[in-house]
Amino acid sequence: MKKAMALLLGFCVLLCSVGALAEPRADLVFTSATISLSSSGTCTFRATTYDEKNRIEITTVYLFKKTNGVWECICSLPRPTYVSSGFIYNAVMNYGDYMGDGMYRVQAMFNADGHEAYRYSNGVDF
């Protein structure tokens, strides 16, 4: 009986120690990846990664316009040419010339050594 109890206790300790190692993450590569769009059309792209990367970049950028309550992709935009390495990516582009009257947001694909993540900016009225 003591042997079975000791074995059960050891198994419980093992399960607890394995569970403590698990880290819940929404994304396995990016700590954060954000796009901020200002009322002047300036778009700031920021990303950080959990581990050091050889290449962090933006691969695609799209402009969305809200029409009758629905976001519609209206065109692709020039992507930032900046490529970083390490843990941090920061780039700024101005897309004001692509926006008329209405509410707009930007979608971009962040890429870190082949791992991709889509993100959307905040919506801004022009």
Predicted regions and their residues:
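Bacterial N-terminal signal peptides
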Residues: 8-16
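Positively charged n-region of N-terminal signal peptides that target proteins for export
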Residues: 1-4, 8
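A short beta-turn/strand-edge loop motif at beta-sheet boundaries
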Residues: 51-57, 101, 116
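Solvent-exposed serine/threonine-rich low-complexity stretches and specific carbohydrate-binding patches
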Residues: 60-61, 70-86
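Short beta-strand elements
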Residues: 114-126
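Sec-dependent signal peptide cleavage junction
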Residues: 15-31
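Surface-exposed, short loops/turns at beta-strand junctions within beta-sandwich domains
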Residues: 93-103
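Structural beta-strand segments of beta-rich domains
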Residues: 39-45
